[in-house]
Amino acid sequence: MGGTINAAIKQKFENEIFDLACFGENQVLLGFSNGRVSSYQYDVAQISLVEQWSTKRHKKSCRNISVNESGTEFISVGSDGVLKIADTSTGRVSSKWIVDKNKEISPYSVVQWIENDMVFATGDDNGCVSVWDKRTEGGIIHTHNDHIDYISSISPFEERYFVATSGDGVLSVIDARNFKKPILSEEQDEEMTCGAFTRDQHSKKKFAVGTASGVITLFTKGDWGDHTDRILSPIRSHDFSIETITRADSDSLYVGGSDGCIRLLHILPNKYERIIGQHSSRSTVDAVDVTTEGNFLVSCSGTELAFWPVDQKEGDESSSSDNLDSDEDSSSDSEFSSPKKKKKVGNQGKKPLGTDFFDGL
């Protein structure tokens, strides 16, 4: 790292921040470990962060939030098995669903809007993916039980489809309008922790998957069976993992790691270009998002929230070009990129590859 990295705004809270989402004009939603969801107006020039509203949204932790495309509503899911839709300007709840008390609760791990501000998807700790329509009384319109570990991310594409990544090392491609079983990748022998699309202006769009080993694997859209490239860990540590990924531009990603750093990663050629920011505690980056205007990256780690200028040039990573791998040399990973899986998983009950469902997607 080549110098001091200064945050435009940095603030500590009493409780841990589990998720965040930027929306509207200089606004950010925060979901906390104590179940509260709060909305803040930020002014980087004045170095201010002003609470607009705050509410006790869940009895237990608020684990994930998602704002719809129009910025008018958001969904929050909690470890209490409750899902709520609310107005972003007031926090007032418009819809609520509760897991059947007679069933064993598997907490929701992730939620994401998919289509037309009406359809969204959830994933839970047991690997279940559900598609919801807020216009229906029961909410859920179809469910997929193809994974055997938690769902770590849901990434929509082309209006009706989405990719779900799982701790079991398998990703699934699902059509929100179709009840057929999803396309499943081969098991990757690495815990998938997050995912995001990139190279979206190119004919061969890529999907990047972060792993617990610190490796990022690239899948080609339409060829979901196995990864085509591997990008090795940016640091030499067996304890480093990729925790969160979000789009920077058509060819780059912001990558949050377990060391508290957010790095800019260029895709094809694959190179970690520089560190955007580093949290004070140097603990796991829990969530990242780009402000609506695109000039700041917002991240959280533990109780700390920070705003980082995306054009800040300190923190170049000159050695990152050495940490590359591809499908042509996948057996020559460096010694510090060995897989670090959460648990031993299998591929029992998975749909075999070779199906023609989603051809070309």
UniProtKB/Swiss-Prot annotation:
GO biological process terms, alphabetically, are: ribosomal small subunit biogenesis
List every stretch annotated Disordered. Answer: 311-361
Q: Which UniProt keywords apply?
A: Nucleus, Repeat, WD repeat
Among its keywords, does the record have Transmembrane helix?
no
Spell out the residue ranges that the record assigns to WD repeats.
Answer: 57-96, 103-142, 146-184, 187-229, 237-275, 280-318
Q: Which GO terms describe its cellular component?
A: nuclear pore outer ring; nucleolus
Q: Where is the protein localized?
A: Nucleus, Nucleolus
PROSITE patterns recorded: WD_REPEATS_REGION
Q: Name any one Pfam family assigned in the record.
A: WDR55
Q: Does the keyword Transit peptide apply?
A: no
What's the protein here called?
Answer: Uncharacterized WD repeat-containing protein C1A6.02
Give the species.
Schizosaccharomyces pombe (strain 972 / ATCC 24843)
Lineage in the entry? Eukaryota, Fungi, Dikarya, Ascomycota, Taphrinomycotina
